[in-house]
């Protein structure tokens, strides 16, 4: 039901589009032709409306008949009985009505197709005639415009040739001025680089001085700590000697008392033998002996208590010795940490040496760049000479000035070459000094490695001593039951021997520390010597930089004079170039206007063609949609009657 309305609106849209399209092109179609087209379009519109109304009526009747036909068929299928005469009549009547309506649909379809084809052919013919006229007119206009464009292009080419010739002369002058400016900028950059390198060297020297001061303070602190350790070890050794003497005296007293008691026991045993022989006197003397025995047992218990106290004192001394050994080990660990810090600082110094090497390499690269710049300057000078020979007829005064400038440049180049040779000699001497400093640093590193090995050996010795002390402690703990049987003098003698061995080892450590101090002092002297050499080199660099600045100032003055002369010429050339550019802009604007006109016409033609194609596509789609709709209706009727 919606198809006719949509077709009507689309036909109206096509009519309005054709009217607008033909109204927008008054040059192609006259007013009479437009009025005829309007009448034809109105007639076709009326015919299309009539056919569309017929199609609407047919579709409405079909819609009304289809549900009735469905109901009858469903009623017959539901009753499941034989068909009666009335039902057959109804079916035949509905079949006749549907066949009539299908015939009307076919007639409407044929009429619509015929009308659509007629309207399409008429529209396409009219549009083609108009387009052919437009194309002929546009071709004639395009030919005229192409002729004008060719004339303008020839004129523009002549102007561009003149402009390029003047541009080349201006570029030559600019190149001369730019080469002088480039040399000036490079010299300024080299001076700035040298100043930055000098500042870096000063900062590096200051950092080295601060590091040397820190090392001196650390060495002093290490010396003070070593002296304190020595004094503490001496005091501990004296205290151990005194304690050993006191223990020896006590042991002697105890041994004397034990011998006396043993003699007394022997005497009493002899007396007991006599009492056994004399049984008569046994009872009387037994009480006396029992009393004396109790007294002796009391004395033995007191002696045992004294021995236990002595053993506790020995244990305390052993613990004190252990603590002292642990303190010594801690101090050794601290010394090892300090040595590691010194190694780290040596690594940092190596890094600074590598940085100095890189700086020397950069200086060498700069020298190579300067040589390349000299070669380029020589090539430029040769090019300038050839240009001067070509321009001798036009500028004899300029030739004389250029010769003078070339002579001055050659003198400056020779002076620079001499200075560069001096700088090379100085750099080579500096490299030799750096290699000597490297060798001194390598020797110092070897010495430090030897010191580290010695410290490791001392650590191993201390560990062995700690193991021996632990073994002695285990022996003391295991042999507590045998202390009464063994002699304490031998143990004291062994302790004294161990104390003497420890003293000898401490003396060896003191000697090694003194050697390390001497090595550190030698390294400090080497560093001071290297600092003095660096200061001397910095002074030499400053003097050379001053000389270079003086030479550069002279060159700058000469360059400024040449730049002023070249600037006056450049201004005159720029004025001419601006005039030519203004003329070119005007001509380019005219050409652009012509091109825009051509483009607008071509775009208008393309738009018209696209719109016509679009309208044709729409009409084709409508025809296809109508055909599909009719086919759908036919298929639906066929399926229903089957």
From Swiss-Prot:
Domain of life: Eukaryota
Principal subcellular localization: cytoplasm
A single BP term in Gene Ontology: cell projection organization
Annotated localization: Cytoplasm, Cytoskeleton, Microtubule organizing center, Centrosome; Cytoplasm, Cytoskeleton, Microtubule organizing center, Centrosome, Centriole; Cytoplasm, Cytoskeleton, Microtubule organizing center, Centrosome, Centriolar satellite; Cytoplasm, Cytoskeleton, Cilium basal body
Coiled coil: 31-58, 128-226, 254-603
Claim: Transit peptide is one of the keywords in the record: no
SS bond list: none
UniProt keyword Coiled coil, yes or no: yes
InterPro entries, per the entry: Odf2-rel (IPR026099)
Any one annotated GO CC term: centriole
UniProt keyword annotations, A-Z: Cell projection, Cilium biogenesis/degradation, Coiled coil, Cytoplasm, Cytoskeleton
Similarity comment text for this entry: Belongs to the ODF2 family.
Function, as annotated: Acts as a suppressor of ciliogenesis, specifically, the initiation of ciliogenesis.
The name this protein goes by in its record: Protein BCAP
Organism of derivation: Mus musculus (Mouse)
Underlying gene: Odf2l
